[in-house]
C-alpha cells in the first residue's frame, strides 16, 4: 500500500480525501518498512515535544491512523492556504492506544499542532457491508484566527434519507 510504497514521496497537496480500510492489518507494510523498532521514515517518526524520535507507529492490526499520518506529511506548509484533509474513520481512531503508544501519539501530535478542525459523526449503515459508526476527520494547517485552538464536533447521525433498496448493510444516504 501507500504506507510502504509512497507513490508521491516529495509531493504536497492542497486537498486530500480518503477512506482508508478500517481495522485492516498493515503488518506487510510494517515488515517492508523494516519492522516496528526500525522504521526511520520521516512520515512516521518525527521530532515533537523535545523528543527527536517521536513515534507514530500504530498497532499492526489497524493502520487507518497511519494513512492519516501519511496525508499529514503531504500538507503544504509554504503556501498561504496550506492544505485540507478529509478522511473517513471508524470509531477506533478516536480512542485506541494507551498514552505513549502510536495511536495516542498521533492524536496528541494532531491536537498540539492545532490541525484538527472538525469531527463529523455520520449516520450508521452508510457503507456497503458494514453497519459500524463512521466519522469524517477534517484537518487543516491554516485555521482561521477565530477557529484556532478549537475543534468542532458535528453530530450528523440523523442527517440521512433511507434508500429504497438496501445495498448490503448500506440503507441510507447523507442528506
Where does each model-flagged region fall?
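SAM cofactor-binding core of SAM-dependent methyltransferases
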Residues: 1
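A conserved structural/catalytic subdomain of Rossmann-like adenosyl-cofactor enzymes
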Residues: 4-175
Amino acid at each position: 500500500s501507500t504506507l510502504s510504497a509512497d507513490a508521491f514521496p516529495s509531493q504536497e497537496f492542497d486537498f486530500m480525501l480518503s477512506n482508508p480500510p478500517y481495522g485492516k492489518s498493515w503488518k506487510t507494510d510494517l515488515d517492508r518498512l523494516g519492522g516496528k523498532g526500525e522504521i526511520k521514515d520521516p512520515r512516521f517518526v518525527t521530532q515533537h515535544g523535545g523528543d527527536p524520535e517521536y513515534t507514530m507507529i500504530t498497532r499492526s492490526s489497524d493502520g487507518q491512523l497511519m494513512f492519516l499520518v501519511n496525508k499529514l506529511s503531504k500538507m503544504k506548509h509554504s503556501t498561504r492556504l496550506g492544505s485540507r484533509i478529509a478522511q473517513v474513520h471508524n470509531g477506533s481512531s478516536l480512542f485506541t492506544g494507551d498514552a505513549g503508544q502510536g495511536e495516542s501519539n498521533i492524536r496528541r501530535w494532531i491536537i498540539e499542532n492545532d490541525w484538527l478542525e472538525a469531527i463529523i459523526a455520520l449516520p450508521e449503515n452508510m457503507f456497503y457491508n458494514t453497519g459500524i459508526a463512521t466519522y469524517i476527520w477534517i484537518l487543516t494547517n491554516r485555521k482561521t484566527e477565530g477557529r484556532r485552538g478549537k475543534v468542532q464536533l458535528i453530530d450528523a447521525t440523523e442527517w440521512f434519507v433511507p434508500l429504497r433498496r438496501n445495498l448490503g448493510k448500506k440503507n441510507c444516504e447523507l442528506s
